[in-house]
């Protein structure tokens, strides 16, 4: 992947116990770190959330209590993760509204400093919404690769 980067960027995705940023916890973190020279590193880390994973969440991501019972809790990997993404910009899908705030909450609970002031954030969902029209015709074309002609009688 060739990107014009001033800093490394970490694209990441979280799997969680739910969608409440203040209450829910991370059960898996997947990251793709891209360096300005094009080098890439990938990691996936399972995390014991210290709470039951609701069936509704497990039905979405396929991770159950049994899968994370021996995984480290976030507080045990927080410093290493913070060091790994130090100096990196962050990117993801819906990351500005969900993943980044939830990750920041987890760092706060673990009492690990996570400075966001010098980072850039790339939310691919925001870019997609700005680039694609929000119409039935545009959605049909995007997903079906066909033109939809709407005839009003």
What is each of the regions a protein language model found here?
Residues 1-118, 133-147:
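Conserved non-catalytic scaffold segment of RNase H-like nuclease domains
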Residues 121-135:
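Short alpha-helix plus adjacent loop in nuclease-associated cores
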Residues 151-153:
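Conserved small/polar residues in nucleotide/adenosyl-binding loops
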């Amino acid at each position: 992947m060739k990107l014009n980067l001033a800093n490394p960027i970490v694209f990441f995705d979280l799997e969680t116990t739910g969608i409440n940023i203040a209450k829910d916890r991370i059960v898996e973190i997947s990251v793709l770190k891209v360096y300005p020279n094009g080098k890439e590193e990938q990691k996936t880390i399972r995390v014991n959330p210290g709470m039951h994973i609701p069936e509704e969440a497990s039905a979405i991501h396929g991770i159950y209590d049994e899968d994370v019972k021996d995984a480290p809790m976030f507080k045990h990997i927080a410093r290493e993760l913070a060091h790994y993404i130090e100096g990196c910009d962050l990117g993801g899908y819906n990351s500005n509204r969900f993943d980044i705030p939830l990750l920041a909450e987890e760092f706060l609970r673990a009492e690990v400093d996570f400075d966001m002031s010098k980072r850039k954030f790339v939310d691919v969902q925001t870019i997609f919404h700005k680039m694609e029209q929000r119409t039935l015709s545009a959605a049909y074309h995007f997903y079906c690769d066909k033109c939809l002609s709407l005839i009003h009688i």
